[in-house]
Structure formats: C-alpha cells, structure tokens
C-alpha cells in the first residue's frame, strides 16, 4: 500500500489544471501533465509527491472537492480500481475512470518548442484575473504579443 499526502502547492496546481481540462491521467512518478481539449494549452508540474501508479480521474474538480472534505487527507493506493481518501475517522473510495474515456490526456513525453521570441512572468493572480475576464466575455483564447517594446495580453 502506498500513501500520498498532497501539498497545498500541488492542490493549487491541480485546481488550476482543472480549468484547463476537467479530466486528467496521472502517471507513475512526480510529474503531472494536462492539455486542453483544443490542444492549445499544455501544462506540466513536478511536485514533491510521488504517485505509485498510473490512474485517471474523469472530473478533477469533483475529485479535489472530495479531498477538501477531509482534515489532513491522505490518498491510499491499494488497488488499480480506486484510491482511498482518508482523514481522521473518515474515509471515502474514489473510483478511477478508464483512461480511454478521459476527455484528452497530455503526452507522456516532453514537447520541444522552438526558441522563444518573448519571455515574461505572469503572476497567478494576474492569470486568474485574465481567466475570469475571459469567462465573463466568453473569450476562449488569450493572445500575447509584443510590439515596439510594449507587451500586451
């Protein structure tokens, strides 16, 4: 039996990943990847947790909400069918989905992009504000461009 305790940072990253794609396939190890259904957003995170096996979650937001019901939750992997979420005297079984029915799973290997023309830092608060504005105005994409020394989103 393997036990995993998700850090706050990992939970925050997974919450962000759930806005990119509602489904996710976790691969054995410490790296988690997601890709949008339109394949225009790809994200990768390496956390301190090591997942003992591959498993798929169909609704990542629901999974994270379930974890939030527990005090100091621990994920216990004892079977390939489900994970036990335990905290205090409470526990719940969360069944994995078939990886074949997840909406879109990220490639297992790294994607090599050509060199960058523009580099910048974007805080998580700014990204959340942009995502909120995008949702309010029903805009599916954000565009980043640079013109005469001015960077614009």
Task: Specify the residue positions occupied by each region the protein language model found.
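DNA polymerase processivity clamps
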Residues: 1-97, 113-153
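Charge-dense, extended regions
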Residues: 100-102
């Amino acid at each position: 039996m393997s036990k995993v305790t998700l850090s706050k940072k990992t939970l925050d990253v997974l919450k962000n990943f759930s806005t990119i794609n509602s489904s996710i396939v976790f691969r054995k190890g410490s790296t988690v990847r997601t890709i949008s259904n339109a394949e225009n957003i790809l994200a990768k995170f390496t956390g301190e947790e090591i997942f003992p096996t591959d498993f798929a979650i169909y609704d990542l937001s629901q999974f994270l909400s379930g974890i939030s019901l527990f005090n100091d939750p621990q994920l216990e992997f004892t079977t390939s069918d489900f994970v036990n979420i335990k905290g205090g005297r409470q526990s719940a079984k969360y069944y994995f989905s078939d990886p074949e029915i997840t909406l879109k799973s990220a490639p297992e290997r790294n994607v090599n992009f050509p060199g960058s023309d523009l580099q910048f830092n974007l805080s998580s608060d700014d990204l959340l504000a942009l995502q909120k504005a995008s949702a309010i105005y029903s805009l599916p994409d954000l565009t980043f461009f640079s013109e005469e020394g001015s960077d614009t989103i």
